[in-house]
């Protein structure tokens, strides 16, 4: 945990009198997908006005969880998202498992505009998905 960041966030939270934080924009994905997302952002400059889009907390899953909890985050999302067909259903399965083994993660699901999306979206809702992340 970056101690300076931790001190800043803790002071901010305490100044506002907040007992904790809910972070609705955190990403946890299968390791191979997470690494590809990081690689994309590393090379995104030409697509976003030739500026960098750095990822500050590029750590292993357990280290990122420790950082969030150190900031006083009481609940957060996994925000999985597919970038092509035939990804969403298995990402939803991964996210359900992640939420089951990580009680402070709100079960997040996703969908892609593809044939059959309605069935895996319905299954995710029935399984308890509380948040959907979608790129349209």
Predicted regions mapped to residue ranges:
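Helix-coil boundary/capping segments in enzymes
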Residues: 1-136
């Amino acid at each position: 945990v970056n101690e300076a960041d931790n001190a800043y966030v803790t002071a901010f939270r305490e100044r506002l009198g907040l007992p904790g934080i809910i972070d609705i924009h955190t990403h946890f994905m299968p390791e191979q997908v997470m690494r590809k997302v990081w690689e994309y952002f590393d090379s995104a400059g030409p697509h976003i006005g030739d500026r960098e889009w750095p990822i500050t907390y590029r750590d292993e899953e357990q280290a990122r969880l420790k950082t969030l909890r150190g900031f006083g985050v009481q609940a957060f999302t996994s925000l999985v998202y597919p970038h092509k067909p035939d990804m969403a259903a298995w990402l939803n399965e991964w996210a359900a498992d992640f939420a089951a083994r990580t009680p402070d993660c709100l079960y997040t699901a996703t969908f892609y505009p593809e044939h059959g999306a309605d069935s895996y979206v319905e299954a995710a809702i029935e399984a308890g998905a509380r948040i959907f992340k979608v790129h349209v």
